[in-house]
From Swiss-Prot:
Protein name, as recorded: NAD-dependent glycerol dehydrogenase
Function: Involved in the glycerol metabolism. Catalyzes the NAD-dependent oxidation of glycerol to dihydroxyacetone (glycerone). GolD specifically uses NAD.
Top-level enzyme category: oxidoreductase
Induction (free text): Repressed by GolR.
Source lineage: Bacteria, Bacillati, Bacillota, Bacilli, Bacillales
Notes on how activity is controlled: Inhibited by Zn(2+).
Active site: 160
PROSITE patterns: ADH_SHORT
Named cofactor requirement(s): Mg(2+); Mn(2+)
EC code(s) of this entry: 1.1.1.6
Keyword Cytoplasm recorded: yes
Molecular function terms, GO-annotated: glycerol dehydrogenase (NAD+) activity; magnesium ion binding; manganese ion binding
Catalytic activity: glycerol + NAD(+) = dihydroxyacetone + NADH + H(+)
Keyword NAD: yes
Length: 254
């Protein structure tokens, strides 16, 4: 591949991008940016208001589907619906997830199960089923949302840390297995991101204490994560696969 210039290499015009967790937070930011950069965007979320988000972004170039991605049959039905509208899927951005926090000795079993089911199983099933489509149609780009918790230990995050570390390992295996099919698979590991949930979880002194541990001195914004995702799903990142891009203001280098 030769460098074609920024306008072409970073261009995703008319690509079909599927984004999970698209009703809010990082997923919503990715859906908005992908659409702004010319992609057709399929927004998936278990919340019904994903349809309102799609309407706000671009009604003529988006498709919103309400789905629980922890069930294989649900994803298969969604992919069938997508194929009625678009000839192929070029991009998958896995952003759906949950954080249920408790000390390890007190963690309810259902917290563990729900975390693994959505964060890990849901992301795998999405990648598996859409990966098959990409193999059949000549390739694609997959971005899995991990976390700084994939590489460091965080208090009360035992289930979350385990699920996100597994996401990175899964990403590496998928990248290795699917490279011959022209499929790039990468992960993104953000620090605390100022989504609505992030703002609530890290409000007050706990947030101020956390920021003191970040060399950059601040938390991140959903748009910053979306920009990195855009790079990874563009031709500019065609030789990058199996990587875990850490977006944490230097937190994990300390």
């Amino acid at each position: 591949m030769t460098f074609k210039g920024f306008d072409k290499d970073f261009n995703i015009t008319d690509k079909v991008a599927v984004v999970t967790g698209a009703a809010s937070g990082i997923g919503k930011a990715m859906a908005e940016l992908f659409s702004e950069k010319g992609a057709y965007v399929v927004l998936l979320d278990i919340k019904e208001d994903v349809k309102d988000v799609a309407a706000q972004i671009n009604p003529s170039r988006t498709l919103a589907l309400q789905v629980d991605i922890t069930k294989k049959e649900n994803i298969e039905k969604v992919v069938a619906e997508i194929k009625k509208v678009y000839p192929k899927i070029d991009i998958l951005a896995n952003s759906a997830g949950v954080a249920l926090l408790e000390k390890a000795e007190d963690l309810p079993e259902e917290y563990w199960d729900k975390t693994m089911e959505l964060n890990l199983k849901g992301s795998f099933l999405m990648a598996q089923i859409i990966g098959r489509e990409m193999i059949a149609t000549g390739g694609g780009k997959i971005v899995n949302m991990a976390s700084q918790a994939s590489v460091i230990a965080l208090d009360k995050h035992v289930a979350y840390c385990a699920s996100k570390a597994a996401i990175v390992s899964m990403t590496q295996v998928l990248a290795m297995e699917w490279a011959p099919y022209n499929i790039n698979v990468n992960a993104i590991s953000p620090t605390v991101i100022l989504t609505e949930l992030g703002k609530k979880a890290w409000a007050g002194q706990v947030g101020e204490d956390m920021k003191k541990l970040i060399p950059a001195g601040r938390f991140g914004y959903p748009e910053e994560v979306a920009a990195c995702a855009l790079f990874l799903v563009s031709d500019a990142a065609s030789l990058i696969t199996g990587e875990n891009l850490i977006i944490d203001g230097g937190y994990t280098i300390k």
